[in-house]
Amino acid sequence: MPDEQLSVREREILVAVCRGLSNQEIADELFISKRTVDKHRANILEKTGCKNTASLVVYAIRNGIVEI
């Protein structure tokens, strides 16, 4: 699925996930609560059809959101 379905904030969080940051570290970096990050991650998983963090990273690479 194309990543246009992700909001700007969801894309920011996906990039941070690919950098290996924990939800708390993402929250601290973006000045939002961990619970908000949890919700965004759940939304990202649902929108992309991914099942876990590893598949999110693969999705991000395949869709040009991050480069290796």
Language-model features, listed with the residues they occupy:
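Residues within the DNA-recognition helix of helix-turn-helix
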Residues: 9, 40-43
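Short, contiguous strand/loop micro-motifs
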Residues: 28, 43-44
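Helix-turn-helix DNA-binding segment
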Residues: 1-34
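Helix-turn-helix DNA-binding elements, focusing on the entry/boundary residues of the two helices
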Residues: 23, 41, 53
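Basic, Lys/Arg-enriched C-terminal extension of HTH/homeodomain DNA-binding domains
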Residues: 45-68
